[in-house]
Amino acid sequence: MFPSVSSPRTPGPGTRRGPLVGIGPTSTPRASRRGLSLGSAVNSPVLFSPAGRRSSVSSRGTPTRIFPHHSISESVNYDVRVFGSSLPVKIMEALTMAEADEQLSVHVDEGGWACLVCTEKLLIWKIAVSPVTKLSVCKELQLPPSDFHGSADLVALSYAATSGEVHSVQAVSVMVATKEGSIRYWPSLAREDTYSDTCVDLGGEKMCRFLTAVQGGSFILSSVGSQLVRLIPESSGKIHQHVLPQGQGMLSGIGRRVSSLFGILSPTSDLMLASVLWDRGGSSFYTLTSSNISKWELDDSSEKQVHSWDVHRTLKESITDAVWGSESNYEAIKEGVNIQYLDLKQNCDGLLILAAAWHLGDSPCLVYYSVITVEDNGNQMSDAVTVEVTQYNPPFQSEDLIACRLMVPNFSSQMTYLYMENAVFVCSTGTGKFSLPQEKIVFDTQGDGILGAGSCAGVPILFSRNSGLVSVTPRENVSLLAEDLEESLTSSVGGRGSESMVFETTTKNETVAHEDKTKLLKAAFLQYCRKDLGRAQIMADELFSSHTDLDSDPELDKAVTQISVDLIDDYPASDPRWAESVPQEAPGLSNTSLIILHQLEDKMKAHCLLVDFLHQVGLFRRLSSYPIRGTPMSTRLLLCEHAEKLSAAITLKNHHSRLPDLVNSAILLALNKRECEVPNSLTPADVFFREVSQVDTICECLLEHEEQVLREVALVSQEWAEVAIDVNTVLKDMLQAATHYRLNKSSMYSQEEVLGKEPEYVPWTATSGPSGIRTAVMRQHGIILKMVYPQADSKLRNVVMEQLVALIDCFLDSYVSQLKSLEKSSDQERYSSLEVEYLQKRSELLSPLLTLGQYPWAASLAEKYCDFDILVQMCEQTDNQARLQRYMTQFADQNFSDFLFRWYLEKGKRGKLLSQPISQHGQLANFLQAHEHLSWLHEINSQELEKAHTTLLGLANMETRYFAKKKTLLGLSKLAALASDISEDRLQEKIEAMAEQERFLLHQETLPEQLLTERQLSLSAMPVLTAPQLISLYICDENRRANEYDFKKALDLLEYIDEEEDVSIDDLKLEILCRALQRDDWSGSDGKDDPIEVSKDSVFVKILQKLIKDGIQLSEYLPEVTDLLRAEQLGSLKSNSYFEFVLKANYEYYVQGQM
């Protein structure tokens, strides 16, 4: 129900950093160690030891008590009570008689029995959750002789009864071992005098360490050196024993996660055994050594080792990164980190490893206890490792004194208990959706101490030397908020216990003021944090019930936004340095952590709980929008923005510890711009980090400081180089933290059904204007490329370029988020204008990378943001055709090929366009369908000759601009047809059709050169002329040398005039003949009486002769002689009687002569 919340620093996949704060008066909290992984910063609120708290235990409320147990230790969040009935008399006597320094140990078995090892005796008694009136069963057994103190780790109970039944005395068998290897076995606890002894020969091995009851009533004895012996009692009393196989069965059926083919350690290895684990459900036995985890599968009499995983390298890296990952000298630190594995347990998430880590170079040197979760996937371990660094960090004293054990009382829960000699520390694995507060509970009264631990019916049980069996369980109403934050939230709504009264009093009025609604919603939120969901639901429903039928409620959006802002900008009023600086109207969400980083992380947890509260009570789905930065913004995304700024602030604070001069300078500039005064009792950092909503104002100030240093400091100085790197780092990490949170937590801020149309989403990382983040990134882009890069050496160039690319990535990602919010919007004009702006900025940012030859970085960004122009330019500049082909495949669904082909066309690179590999021929053909003037080349190259013929013929038919081009296209089409596989009949038909076109073109090709020169025409540049245009040229006056051939061509061209053309063929024929008649002199007969003889050399008569020769029937072809004589085109010839005589004579001679 309560989700985990992320901090903005992620050490790696699956890792988790827990809050690191000292527990107890001798510990020193270190802000730089407070690193949490993304996803865990607020799972565990900051809690100091109970002695340091302001509030009393009673102030947290009184839990319901089922049984009359009495509390034996004060704890804020947990009930520490005597468990079950009073101890048996024998147990109390043994505790009373034991010397103060005598080594006692207890084993609490989950089967409902407990064992106390005391000198030479073993006391076993029955325990139960509920107290009973009769005396508990208690048996006293004699231990086998030994030179060493006995240990409860070498006591094991096996049960004959099936799971779930009450284990009677008769059903319990007991086996004990001494450290030397002596074994004693009681088949039934009911007959304590009946037992059998044997001895295990360890072959010079070190001491025995653990004895574990396993499958089929058998046991496994484990030595310090990790040798394992299976002990199987027989009904005769004999105990059969054999060594477990190590290194067998590993070469078949297992995964390759084994670190080495022969990674199974031999029994003679120097590795030290840390812990063993029996998984009853999976019939699996695990061992944890200083280097590896091994797993065996067992049946009643045999074993098979199925896995051995070298954990040390992986776990050391994960733990080291989780604890010291934020340190500036991390690379140097990690070499000196010491790791010790302490215990191995199991829960629903996998195997749990308890580890301690310390670094002797730390001052002070603390021991960091971590709980690591590793999933067992059957025959191999998962690569994902979750590291929860607990808040238990005692000072390091000696490696020999590191003694801590792990207890997991409930398999289905993530709650864990770390216990040592005089204290227990309650925490969680960090893998659950939420976690209860971490707390250390001390057993340090005189003579007290923890002798052992275990669980019964899922209840965690400790055995205290003074109090006996003790349970440690969470209080029923423990709040999920850090205590101080929860207390101040309570005070903001009127004090503890007044939430309901305030609510009931206020809601009696019909109209509730907005301020009251905000206060009442806080009160409901507080109930939720105390896990009273029912009350929180009632309060939320009553508060906004009048608007349940409406699409949205502006009052709800306003109240939610106000609470969220109040939370992230909370005043740490309990910090004495802030006491005089908190305004009277402060919202009352104060916390008391004196460390800024802790304050930010507590705010993050509270903010996450606020969002989860809104989901749980049904208010989140009713959120609409709220104005921010002058425009409306979806309220759900505004809540996400607040959490993003918390992530960014946590990141900035981590850099503040590493780069105090830079960050402090920027903080001072930011506070001056905002006109914020810094009280004498506070530092500028205190004031700045308090107001998280304004954390983005530091970006502009970082750049101002950087520019000043670059101007004033000498190029050769180290400061000149470092300032650019440091500013880049801070900006980059802040923006990446925000973006990472936005992406990872998107489901947390999503709505199943969005109310109406959401406004455009402008993330705070996408703000423009003088102080906007986009403006800052563009400005830094210019600073790096103009001021730093030209002066830097190769090493510095590589560093700043990598950082700059990360900044550009954040910049472009914000545009993508903004564009996605407009995809479903009806405002396409806004989408289009923003897209144009995005494409322009993308080009401005990436083009310089190409210019500088930073091809890998340019490629990474251009690939991510699909800047195809950059990708093509890069491949052309580097002549990398293989990469181009890869992009065609990679971006096939985004038409990269079309973009590339179009780019080639625009750049005039037609050779490259048409020389694509066969794999791209299909896409090229599709592209060239819209570019037929090139597609025929591709078709010829692809041997598609008939298709090329068709394309060329189509181009020739459409060509009107250039005669020469039309003639060439027609000729190529003819050649393609002749070279194709077209059938003979179809080929002949096509050739004839093309020949007809060629005959027409021949009329233009044979225009007299004199005429072309006169008209200033050239065949190579002439357009394609129509038949009437050609006729006009052939018969025009400029064609002074025109003869019968020219006029015959003009008459022939009449056949090429389409019916669709608005031209009268008869009128045009009449004009041609009139023009021909005008070419001769018809003034006299020159002394000749025969008109036929006189006119035989005229152009007109020669035309008639050619027509007759071509077989044309003149009577049908020529106009009537009367029509010809009346034609206006004859001009003066119309009135020439001699011309009329001769014309009629020739008509009679030639026309009638054909009849």
Curated annotation (Swiss-Prot):
One of its GO terms (biological process) is nucleocytoplasmic transport. Forms part of the Nup160 subcomplex in the nuclear pore which is composed of NUP160, NUP133, NUP107 and Nup96. This complex plays a role in RNA export and in tethering Nup98 and NUP153 to the nucleus. Belongs to the nucleoporin Nup133 family. Residues 8-19 have a biased composition (Low complexity). It comes from the Eukaryota. The modification Phosphothreonine is found at T28. The modification N-acetylmethionine is found at M1. Residues 1-36 are annotated as: Disordered. The modification Phosphoserine is found at S7, S27, S37, S40, S44, S49, S71, S130, S479, S488, S492, S500, S1132. The modification Omega-N-methylarginine is found at R17, R30, R34. GO terms for molecular function: structural constituent of nuclear pore. Involved in poly(A)+ RNA transport. Involved in nephrogenesis. It is found in: Nucleus, Nuclear pore complex; Chromosome, Centromere, Kinetochore. Gene3D superfamilies: 1.20.58.1380, 1.25.40.700, YVTN repeat-like/Quinoprotein amine dehydrogenase. The keyword Protein transport applies. InterPro entries: Nucleoporin_Nup133/Nup155_C, Nup133-like, WD40/YVTN_repeat-like_dom_sf. This is Nuclear pore complex protein Nup133. Keywords: Acetylation, Centromere, Chromosome, Kinetochore, Methylation, mRNA transport, Nuclear pore complex, Nucleus, Phosphoprotein, Protein transport, Translocation, Transport. The gene is Nup133. PANTHER family: NUCLEAR PORE COMPLEX PROTEIN NUP133. The lineage of its organism: Eukaryota, Metazoa, Chordata, Craniata, Vertebrata. One of its GO terms (cellular component) is nuclear pore. The modification N6-acetyllysine is found at K786.
